[in-house]
């Protein structure tokens, strides 16, 4: 049986979910003097499980905060694509992910342990859970990263998931 399924397909206001997650993380951001920028189209609605979508955005933002330097910025966006789909992005200004590690970051318990990337707390399960949420929602993910230049996670929802 499938380890994760979409039990409730609802129309989800993506901008509201993103703002909600940003608000939940605001105290942590202030503590580390990190700014969260939200750029989300208020008219975007997707079909999905609300709890899982909150969890997905939270995992991606939590990782971005973990790897962001003091006085850094995390950017979260949601925009419609020309093909009718939706693109959600979460970007940080951290150290980045070595190219050779990118294919493995979605695996359970995988942690990037390189001398140029500081060690951060965590179980190594967040992105594995995120991958499953992305999959069951019919979306796809891409990671754009270069050591020293931060990381951007792009989640693309196809037009049949957009309301």
Roles of regions detected by a PLM:
Residues 138-139:
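Conserved glycine-rich
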Residues 71-84:
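Short beta-strand/loop element within the Bergerat-fold HATPase_c
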Residues 8-23, 37:
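A conserved beta-strand-to-alpha-helix junction within the catalytic ATP-binding
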Residues 92:
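Acidic ATP/Mg2+-coordinating residue in the GHKL
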Residues 2-8, 45-48:
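Conserved micro-motifs of the catalytic ATP-binding
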Residues 10-11, 30-31, 35-44, 81:
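Conserved catalytic submotifs in the C-terminal HATPase_c
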Residues 97-111:
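Short conserved segment of the HATPase_c
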């Amino acid at each position: 049986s499938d380890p994760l399924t979409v039990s409730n397909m609802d129309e989800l206001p993506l901008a509201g979910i993103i703002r909600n997650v940003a608000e939940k993380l605001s105290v942590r951001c202030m503590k580390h003097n990190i700014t969260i920028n939200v750029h989300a189209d208020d008219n975007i609605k997707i079909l999905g499980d609300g709890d899982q979508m909150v969890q997905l955005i939270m995992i991606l933002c939590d990782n971005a905060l973990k790897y962001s330097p003091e006085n850094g910025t995390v950017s979260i966006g949601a925009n419609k694509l020309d093909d009718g789909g939706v693109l959600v992005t979460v970007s940080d200004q951290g150290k980045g992910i070595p190219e050779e590690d990118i294919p493995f970051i979605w695996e359970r318990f995988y942690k990037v342990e390189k001398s140029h990337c500081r060690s951060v707390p965590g179980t190594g399960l967040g992105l594995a859970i995120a991958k499953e949420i992305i999959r069951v929602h019919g979306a796809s993910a891409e990671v754009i990263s270069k050591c020293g230049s931060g990381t951007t996670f792009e989640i693309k929802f196809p037009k049949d998931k957009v309301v």
